């Protein structure tokens, strides 16, 4: 036996007992005849006292030990002197006086600090991830993730869901991002794909009669990486039969309300979760995933300046654009240099420029970038519409609607952060519903599915599919949390004729549809029930609940933003023999 107790287990009731502990040297303090070692495992820390008078052999072991050595210690639990109590650790009332000690494994000096945050480059942390994971913060994050996943499993089991594993090697079908392809040795020239999601498989499980399915699913997407994306990620994959949109939203709301109250009880959340239509979210916030912990809503002044002769307004409005603004409370004290930095931020977001005005106090003059181009009445009308108060900074964008939305969304997030408007102890869950079914791809001159090609159109919009596809709304919904998309789902198409109509709209000809999705089309002819589902992202939700800023901090072994595993050096070249067995020749053009 290596240990009788963990390093976080001993309390006052253990005083007088002989115990056997094993763990890592967290800290070591040498006072000559007395050496103090904080012994650590994932459960906590216990202070070990090595006294040369009581046990010279154990003292000699402690004398040679260094940080991160793996030690086994036998000793007696003793109450600490009252002045030596440590309220910061659970074992702070006791210490163990060592009688025996064994070095189970020495350790080189670690390239990063384990017993404190060292501020190292992330590349170093990822290269030595097995050391980084020893840190208290990382152990806390991984344990939080475990508790979240366990809670989800237990909750869904009580709700009658069945956990079913779906294949990792599947057929390659277009789902938006690039597939990771796996060559088949047994079938030369053919490939499997790693699943971007179990979407088609879970729908087929509904056809099979498993009316409540879930899976903690590993998913893979070969896409350009962003701060909150990984090439492989984990989602809670769910599907239900004989449900409508309200049924899906209800169970997810109950799940995450209960989860947050259990796992992060110190955080506040509003229930029921607010519901915004896609059109409303874009109109009010310029985003389909707004952070609802603060206001800063967009204000449309297009009608206010409709008769203006100002060229910037005219150029936008005469070509179907918008003039919208954002009121930043108290930011009128910004210097010209600071305002110029905000203007540059708007340009980086895609805007041609950014108009600004500072609301004056009573009797004062408006300081602005466009005061000479508009009349005093027009300026006053803009300030009234935007509810400007003295000292406010008004920011205005005049551009096509898409540019206006993405620019003001970027500025809204920027000032939300600058003004500390987002309370970290608030969880602003919400739903965004009624997404468009399709969007026009200008570059390829065709319609693309906004979510995926199995999303059902709203019944009342079916008649528009042939005449005005851009106005067709989908039975789709996104779960958002603190400005992130936490999950997406929809009611699915379950009839072959409707599925074929959508394929036709997306420009997928009948032959291609049968080749890529024939298994789905055929299954729909064997009594497919109405069904729908959702796939919340485990990594993203864990990140937010852990108060981290990237999902890499809640994943045990993440990759870099360039999709590289610095610890194992993956991806890596393979032997020529392996390539020959797979009938593959490389052409590195």
Curated annotation (Swiss-Prot):
Matching entries from InterPro entries are given as: Aa-tRNA-synt_II, aa-tRNA-synth_II, aa-tRNA-synth_II/BPL/LPL, Asp-tRNA-ligase_1, Asp-tRNA-ligase_1_N, Asp/Asn-tRNA-synth_IIb, AspRS_core, GAD-like_sf
Main location, first listed in the record:
cytoplasm
Residues marked Important for tRNA non-discrimination (site): 31
Sequence positions that bind ATP: 221-223, 230, 485, 537-540
- Report the EC code(s) recorded for this entry: 6.1.1.23
Molecular-function annotations in GO? aspartate-tRNA ligase activity; aspartate-tRNA(Asn) ligase activity; ATP binding; nucleic acid binding
- Where is this gene product found? Cytoplasm
Q: Which GO terms describe its cellular component?
A: cytoplasm
CDD domains, A to Z: AspRS_core, EcAspRS_like_N
Known catalytic reactions: tRNA(Asx) + L-aspartate + ATP = L-aspartyl-tRNA(Asx) + AMP + diphosphate
Family statement drawn from the similarity comment of this UniProt entry: Belongs to the class-II aminoacyl-tRNA synthetase family. Type 1 subfamily.
Q: What functional role does this protein have?
A: Aspartyl-tRNA synthetase with relaxed tRNA specificity since it is able to aspartylate not only its cognate tRNA(Asp) but also tRNA(Asn). Reaction proceeds in two steps: L-aspartate is first activated by ATP to form Asp-AMP and then transferred to the acceptor end of tRNA(Asp/Asn).
The protein's matches in HAMAP family, at most eight in alphabetical order, are given as: Asp_tRNA_synth_type1 (MF_00044)
Question: Which named protein is this?
Answer: Aspartate--tRNA(Asp/Asn) ligase
Q: What is the lineage of its organism?
A: Bacteria, Bacillati, Chloroflexota, Chloroflexia, Chloroflexales
Q: Which gene encodes it?
A: aspS
């Amino acid at each position: 036996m290596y240990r009788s107790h963990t390093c976080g287990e001993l309390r006052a009731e253990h005083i007088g007992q002989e115990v056997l502990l094993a763990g890592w040297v967290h800290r070591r303090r040498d006072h000559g005849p007395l050496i103090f070692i904080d012994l650590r495992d994932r459960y906590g820390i216990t202070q070990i006292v090595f006294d040369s008078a009581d046990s010279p052999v154990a003292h000699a072991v402690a004398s040679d030990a260094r940080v991160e050595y793996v030690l086994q210690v036998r000793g007696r639990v003793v109450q600490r002197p009252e002045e030596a109590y440590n309220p910061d650790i659970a074992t702070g009332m006791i210490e163990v006086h060592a009688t025996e000690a064994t070095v189970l494994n020495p350790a080189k000096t670690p390239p990063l600090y384990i017993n404190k945050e060292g501020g190292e480059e992330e590349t170093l942390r990822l290269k030595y991830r097995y050391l980084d994971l020893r840190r208290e913060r990382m152990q806390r994050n991984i344990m939080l993730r475990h508790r979240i996943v366990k809670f989800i499993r237990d909750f869904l089991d009580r709700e009658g869901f069945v956990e079913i594993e779906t294949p990792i090697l599947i057929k390659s079908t277009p789902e938006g991002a690039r597939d990771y392809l796996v060559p088949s040795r047994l079938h030369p020239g053919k490939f499997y794909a790693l699943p971007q999601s179990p979407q088609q498989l879970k729908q087929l499980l509904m056809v099979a009669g498993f009316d409540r399915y879930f899976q903690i699913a590993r998913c893979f997407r070969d896409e350009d990486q962003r701060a909150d994306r990984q090439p492989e990620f984990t989602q809670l994959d769910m599907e239900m039969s004989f449900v409508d949109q309200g049924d899906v939203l209800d169970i997810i709301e109950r799940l995450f309300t209960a989860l947050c109250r259990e796992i992060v009880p110190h955080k506040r959340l509003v229930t029921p979760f607010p519901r915004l239509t896609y059109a409303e979210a874009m109109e009010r916030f310029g985003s389909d995933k707004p952070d609802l912990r603060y206001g800063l809503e967009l204000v449309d002044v297009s009608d206010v300046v409709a008769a203006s002769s100002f060229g910037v307004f005219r150029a936008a409005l005469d070509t179907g654009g918008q003039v919208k603004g954002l009121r930043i409370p108290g930011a009128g004290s910004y210097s010209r240099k600071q305002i110029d930095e905000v203007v540059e931020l708007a340009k980086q977001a895609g805007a041609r420029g950014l108009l600004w005005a500072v609301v004056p106090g009573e009797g004062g003059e408006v300081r602005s970038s466009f005061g000479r181009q508009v009349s005093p009445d027009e300026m006053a009308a803009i300030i009234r519409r935007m509810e400007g108060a003295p000292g406010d900074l008004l920011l205005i964008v005049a551009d096509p609607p898409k540019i206006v939305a993405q620019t003001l969304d970027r500025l809204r997030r920027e000032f939300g952060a600058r003004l500390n408007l987002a309370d970290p102890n608030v969880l602003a869950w919400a739903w965004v519903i009624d997404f468009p079914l399709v969007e026009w791809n200008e570059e390829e001159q065709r319609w693309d599915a906004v979510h995926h090609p199995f999303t059902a159109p709203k019944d009342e919009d079916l008649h528009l599919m042939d005449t005005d596809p851009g106005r067709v709304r989908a039975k789709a919904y996104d779960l958002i949390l603190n400005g992130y998309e936490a999950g997406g789902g929809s009611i699915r198409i379950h009839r072959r004729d409707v599925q074929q109509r959508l394929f036709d709209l997306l420009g997928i000809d009948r032959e291609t549809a049968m080749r890529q999705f024939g298994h789905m089309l055929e299954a729909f002819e064997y009594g497919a029930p109405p069904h729908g589902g959702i796939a919340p992202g485990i990594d993203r939700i864990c990140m937010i609940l852990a108060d981290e800023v990237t999902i890499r901090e809640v994943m045990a072994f993440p990759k870099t933003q360039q999709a590289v595993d610095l610890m194992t050096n993956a991806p890596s070249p393979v032997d020529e023999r392996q390539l020959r067995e797979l009938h593959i020749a490389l052409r590195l053009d």
